[in-house]
Amino acid sequence: PAQVEVDADGQRLIVSAKEQMVLRCGKASITLTKAGKVLLEGSYVLSRSTGVNRVKGGSVQLN
């Protein structure tokens, strides 16, 4: 049986998995891995902010 931990206290929801977690809807998905990778996939991705929209990393590649 799959081992998934869920903790909800009315303020926040925490879902934990040991190796990888995928949230999927149609062609869109968010994947979180144990190694710390976060993968966003979809036919259209939008990032919007009323304040600063910051991208930080060891290196950042656009296009």
Model region roles, listed by residue range:
Residues 1-63:
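Right-handed beta-helix
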